[in-house]
């Protein structure tokens, strides 16, 4: 083994060891390779030889973009400052002090600012946006020079308005009594206690109750002693004019036996009071100083007056009628 090691000799160019016979062949080849660089072998060209396939040009490798320096330290400091400011604001809100001014906005230095709209974009987005923003700003400038303001709102088209409803003339305005809320059994013939308003034949004076105001009713329905004498209480005018007719009366509100018993028991009235005349059938009206007889039931809604000296109905508010 020692003899073989002594026989090996190193090459002066590459430093490798060879036998003396092999070294003589290696030295001239090593000198050529050191002077002239070896070409890279392209297997694609070798496979394409003898065929119709065109030799593809080798793709040049793209230069690697320079690596950006990481700004992790600056981002870390901004994050810590944001957390501290949030804690300070929460403490001030608990104590009730004045809020400090907001911190200045932080910008990413890697972003590119647009010279037209002053916004910031990534490098790839900025390359597309700046060209578009440049053309848009040029168009807007031409519109302003032409006299059109882009910020001005467009003119609004006139909207169609429907015609207003026709109002009734003062002569056709209904009386206050007709505007009052009516009970559900309004206009239905019922049987029960007779009301002050009676149903008369067509052409009779009793039809004036539905077309005239309460004040006009009082002036037209007062009977004088010379004309026919005062009627007794609770005697309907229709029975006096037509004693043979047994028709039911048109009332605003129906009463049953239970409803009639409650107000009498509460107010202390007796059923015998309905047939007795009040002050011999004559009382003096407080407002117009005319002698007449007061009704015990409202001629509008049929509600019984709770007291003898009531001037208005407690349900519908219509003035009490004097017969």
Curated annotation (Swiss-Prot):
Sequence ranges of Polar residues compositional bias: 208-226
Annotated positions binding Zn(2+) 1: 11, 14, 26, 30
Domain of life from the UniProt record: Eukaryota
Zinc-finger is among the record's keywords: yes
Positions with biased composition (Basic and acidic residues): 40-50
Assigned keywords, A-Z: Metal-binding, Repeat, Zinc, Zinc-finger
Binding site for Zn(2+) 2: 114, 117, 129, 133
Start and end residues of each stretch annotated as Disordered: 35-75, 138-273
Gene3D superfamilies in the record: Classic Zinc Finger
Cofactor dependency: Zn(2+)
Classification via Pfam families: zf-C2HC_2
Single GO MF descriptor: zinc ion binding
Cysteines joined through disulfide linkages: none
Coiled coil: none
Zn-finger region bounds: C2HC/C3H-type: 7-36, 110-139
PANTHER family, A to Z: C2H2 ZINC FINGER CGI-62-RELATED (PTHR13555), ZINC FINGER C2HC DOMAIN-CONTAINING PROTEIN 1A (PTHR13555:SF25)
Entry similarity comment: Belongs to the ZC2HC1 family.
Name under which the protein is recorded: Zinc finger C2HC domain-containing protein 1A
Native source organism of the sequence: Xenopus laevis (African clawed frog)
Lineage summary: Eukaryota, Metazoa, Chordata, Craniata, Vertebrata
């Amino acid at each position: 083994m020692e003899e073989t090691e002594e026989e090996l000799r190193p090459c002066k160019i590459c430093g490798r060891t060879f036998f003396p016979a092999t070294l003589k062949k290696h030295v001239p080849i090593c000198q050529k390779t050191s002077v002239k660089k070896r070409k890279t072998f392209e297997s694609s060209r070798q496979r394409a030889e003898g065929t119709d396939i065109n030799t593809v040009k080798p793709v040049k490798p793209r230069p690697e973009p320079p690596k950006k320096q990481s700004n992790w330290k600056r981002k870390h400091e901004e994050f810590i400052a944001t957390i501290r400011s949030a804690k300070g604001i929460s403490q001030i809100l608990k104590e009730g002090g004045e809020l400090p001014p907001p911190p200045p906005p932080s910008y990413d230095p890697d972003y590119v600012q647009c010279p037209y709209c002053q916004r910031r974009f990534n490098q790839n987005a900025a390359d597309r946006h700046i060209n578009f923003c440049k053309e848009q700003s040029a168009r807007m400038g031409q519109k302003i020079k032409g006299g059109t303001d882009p910020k001005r709102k467009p003119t609004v088209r006139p909207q169609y308005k429907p015609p207003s409803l026709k109002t009734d003339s003062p002569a056709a305005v209904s009386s206050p009594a007709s505007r009052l809320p009516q009970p559900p059994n309004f206009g239905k013939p019922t049987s029960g206690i007779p009301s002050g308003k009676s149903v008369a034949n067509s052409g009779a004076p009793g039809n004036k109750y539905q077309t005239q105001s309460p004040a006009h009713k009082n002036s037209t329905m007062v009977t004088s002693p010379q004309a026919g004498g005062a009627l007794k209480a609770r005697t309907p005018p229709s029975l006096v004019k037509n004693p043979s007719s047994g028709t039911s009366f048109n009332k605003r509100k129906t009463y049953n036996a239970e409803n009639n018993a409650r107000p009498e028991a509460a107010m202390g009235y007796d059923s015998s009071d309905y047939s007795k005349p009040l002050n011999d059938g004559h009382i003096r009206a407080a407002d117009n100083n005319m002698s007449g007889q007061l009704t015990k039931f409202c001629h509008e809604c049929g509600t019984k007056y709770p007291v003898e000296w009531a001037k208005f109905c407690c349900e519908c508010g219509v003035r009490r009628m004097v017969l």
